[in-house]
Amino acid sequence: MIPTPTRDAPNIPSFLAADVGGTHVRVSVVAAAPTCASPPQLFDVRTYRCADYPSLSTILNDFLGTRSAVRDCVIASAGFQRSDGTVITTNLPWPLSPHRLRADLNLAEVCLVNDFEALAYATEDMEPAQLLHLTGPAKAQDGPRLLLGPGTGLGAALWIPNNGRPIVLPTEAGQAALPSTTELEMQLVRHMLNNRTHVPIEHALSGPGILNVYRALCALQSVLPQHASPDAISHAAAAGTDMLSSQTLEVFCDFLGSIVGDLVMMYGAQGGVYLAGGILPQLREPLLRSHFVERFLNKGPMGEALQHVPVRLIEHGQLGIVGAARWYLNKKAT
């Protein structure tokens, strides 16, 4: 069960948890649950726009205010973590270093975790009301679960059952090469290769990716783009006022279905797929109308096996914080 956040300060030891994306940072004070089976309790959840602040330290300092009792912090963020703790990412507006955060905020401990690794830990707290079933059986088989979602980039992680202490494998699936199936997709990828030697999956499956696909479609049809943002494209598609905007979302959903099917087979994710990220809940209706399921199952003889894999859309904005807190509490318990 996802905890209901409150604004009251906890009377038990607590820590700071943050979900840092390329566009927004969500922050909360977290109190440890009374048992490992209970979800952590969130207090005073706030959302900040990254573009409004010069650094993550500034955001966290604003949130902490006079909370001098909070001494520890866990941060979920996209990117690859180096051995020295710093994060390599193309999607954040500023560097991310636990050493700098610890010094800037006078904290005892700052831990970093991959955002989709954190989200994978939150699957234990999801309720049916937070999930939209897209395909497959209502009950999944036992086995690994795939977490994937487009936002500022494309995040992905694998949750692996392990006798009550699951293992989560963060990945950089969004940096793998973008595959193409149809003639149109091949033309799009060839166009994208005009000014680069590698087209990653997230070049199409992300917020910026929607704009990349739209511009490529415009170029292929020799027309000038009418929209300059993913939101404008989505609004035009919803209003039915621009055929290329509608086609952009169709191509986006086709790519998504095909790639999710590929990753399920690569990772053996028989435990199901959870689609998350900041974009898909906003594209719920185009996704439901799309060929997503058809493309997900279009894997030759393996399509029959994929029919037994449930795919669900996650609709809960605080799961990143909950998952980061779960990860941190598990770390402290070992």
UniProtKB/Swiss-Prot annotation:
Signal sequence range: none
InterPro entries: ATPase_NBD, Bacterial_glucokinase, Glucokinase
GO MF, any single term: glucokinase activity
TM annotation in the entry: none
SUPFAM superfamilies recorded: Actin-like ATPase domain
Residues annotated for ATP binding in this entry: 18-23
Keywords: ATP-binding, Kinase, Nucleotide-binding, Transferase
Xref: Pfam families: Glucokinase
Any one of the GO BP annotations: glycolytic process
Keyword Kinase: yes
The keyword Nucleotide-binding appears for this protein: yes
Domain of life: Bacteria
One cellular-component annotation, GO: cytosol
Sequence similarity: Belongs to the bacterial glucokinase family.
This protein's name: Glucokinase-like protein PD_0680
